[in-house]
Amino acid sequence: MNLETIIGLEVHVELKTNSKIFSASPTEFGAEPNTQTSVIDLGYPGVLPTLNKEAVNFAMKAAMALNCEIATETKFDRKNYFYPDNPKAYQISQFDKPIGENGWIEIEVDGKKKRIGITRLHLEEDAGKSTHTADGSLVDYNRQGMPLIEIVSEPDMRTPEEAYAYLEKLKSIIQYTGVSDCKMEEGSLRCDANISLRPVGQEKFGTKAELKNLNSFTYVQKGLEHEQVRQEKELLSGGIIQQETRRYDEATKKTILMRVKEGSDDYRYFPEPDLVELYIDDAWKEEVRASIPELPDARKARYVAEIGLPAYDAHVLTLTKEMSDFFEAAIADGADAKLTSNWLMGEVLAYLNKQQKELKDVALTPAGLSKMVQLIEKGTISSKIAKKVFNELIEKGGDPEEIVKAKGLVQISDEGTLRKVVTEILDNNEQSIEDFKNGKDRAIGFLVGQIMKATKGQANPPLVNKILLEEINKR
C-alpha cells in the first residue's frame, strides 16, 4: 500500500502594536512578570474591552499580503475554556467571520513551485504563560491580551520539506509587511502542525496527529519527518492511528505523546457580547492596501530583472527584509551588486550564523561594506586582504580606507616592485620552474604562494600571475 502524507499548519503571529488588543496595557517583551497587565486583561467584573484599531490594520495588512479576501463584516467571539493562564475562562477570538479567508502563498522546493492555500486568518488575544517548577506552577499574565493573528493553512503540503518552505515564506512575507518581527525565541511566532497519512488516490483524510511545542522551523520539519515514519509503520503493520497531541523531543529525535483526543474540542463559541460587529468598507481596505511595501517575490524578481543578480542570490538576499534592505543600501552607495551579494551570502551570513546574531547586532554598516567592496573593485585591496578588513568592520565598525591605512594593508600593484619580488623567488626556486615547464601546473601555485608569503599577502594576484608567467618564459 502506497501512502500519501497530508500536512496542514496553524501559525500564531504576535502583532507589533504598542498596546494590547483590547486594553491600553504595554506590549514590551521581557518585562518583569505581571507588570504589563490590567483589570481588562484579567477580566475583572464590570470592565469592557476596547478594540485596538492598529491591530485590525495589521491583521488586514497581513491578510492582503497573503492574498486573502478581506471580510466586509467581521465579528469577535468567545472561545470558552478553563486553564490557569486564561484568567477570564474565555478567549476573545473570531469563529465564523474571520477577517481574511481564501488566501495563498507560493513556495519552491527542489526547483518546483507550488501554491499552498490559506483557509483563514483571524484576530484573537493571547493567553498568559505558565511556568512549571518542582514546587508548583507560576503564571505570568504579561502576554495575556497580546494581539495575535492565527493563520490556518489548507492541508496542501505533502512533505516536511514543503512545510519548512511554507513557514520560511510565511515568515518572510509577514516581516516585510512590518506587522510582526516573527521571533520564535520570543514567542512572537508559534506553530502547530497537523499530519495524517492516507492511501494514494483516497480522498478521505486519515486520522491526524497534532504536533505542539515546536520552537523552530527545523523542529517542525524534524517532528513531521519522525511522525510520518511512525504513522507509516503503524498503518503498514495493520494498526490504527489515534487522534493525538504530541510534541517533538530533540534529545530522542522522536515525537512523544502528550494526550489522546477522544473527540473534537468543544469551546462553546458564541458572539462576544461586549464588542459590536466590525464593518470594513472599501475605503478602509484601500488605505491599508496602499501601506503594503514591496514583498519578497516582487523584490526577488526586480533583483534578477533590473539588477542582474542570479536567481539564487536574489532568493537568499530577500529571505529577510533586514538583509535585503542592507543590500540595497550598500549598492546605493556605489558598490558592485554581485560582489556585494557574494560578501553578504558568504562572509556576513557565516559570521551571523556562527555568532547567532542578526545584522542589527553587529557593527557592520551598509556604507562600510560598500566602501570595502569598492576598494576591492579599484584594486586597492585583494579579496584576501578584504577579509582582514571585514573582521574589523563587523566587530568594531569604522572606515575601510582608514583601517587599510592603519594596518598597512594596501595591495601592492606597482609592477616594478612585484617584478623584483618575482625575480627573487624564481632565482631561489629553479626546480619549480623546470617542473612547470614539464607540465606540472601545481608548481605555479607553489610559486604564487611564495610570492604572496614574501609580500604578506598584499600582492595583486592577477598582476602576480601575469609577471610570473612573463619571467618564467624568459628563462
From Swiss-Prot:
The keyword Transmembrane does not apply. It is an enzyme of class 6 (ligase). It catalyses: L-glutamyl-tRNA(Gln) + L-glutamine + ATP + H2O = L-glutaminyl-tRNA(Gln) + L-glutamate + ADP + phosphate + H(+); L-aspartyl-tRNA(Asn) + L-glutamine + ATP + H2O = L-asparaginyl-tRNA(Asn) + L-glutamate + ADP + phosphate + 2 H(+). One of its GO terms (molecular function) is glutaminyl-tRNA synthase (glutamine-hydrolyzing) activity. SMART domains: GatB_Yqey (SM00845). Keywords: ATP-binding, Ligase, Nucleotide-binding, Protein biosynthesis. It comes from the Bacteria. The keyword Protein biosynthesis applies. Its EC number is 6.3.5.-. GO terms for biological process: glutaminyl-tRNAGln biosynthesis via transamidation; translation. Heterotrimer of A, B and C subunits. Belongs to the GatB/GatE family. GatB subfamily. Allows the formation of correctly charged Asn-tRNA(Asn) or Gln-tRNA(Gln) through the transamidation of misacylated Asp-tRNA(Asn) or Glu-tRNA(Gln) in organisms which lack either or both of asparaginyl-tRNA or glutaminyl-tRNA synthetases. The reaction takes place in the presence of glutamine and ATP through an activated phospho-Asp-tRNA(Asn) or phospho-Glu-tRNA(Gln). HAMAP family: GatB. This is Aspartyl/glutamyl-tRNA(Asn/Gln) amidotransferase subunit B. The lineage of its organism: Bacteria, Bacillati, Bacillota, Bacilli, Bacillales.
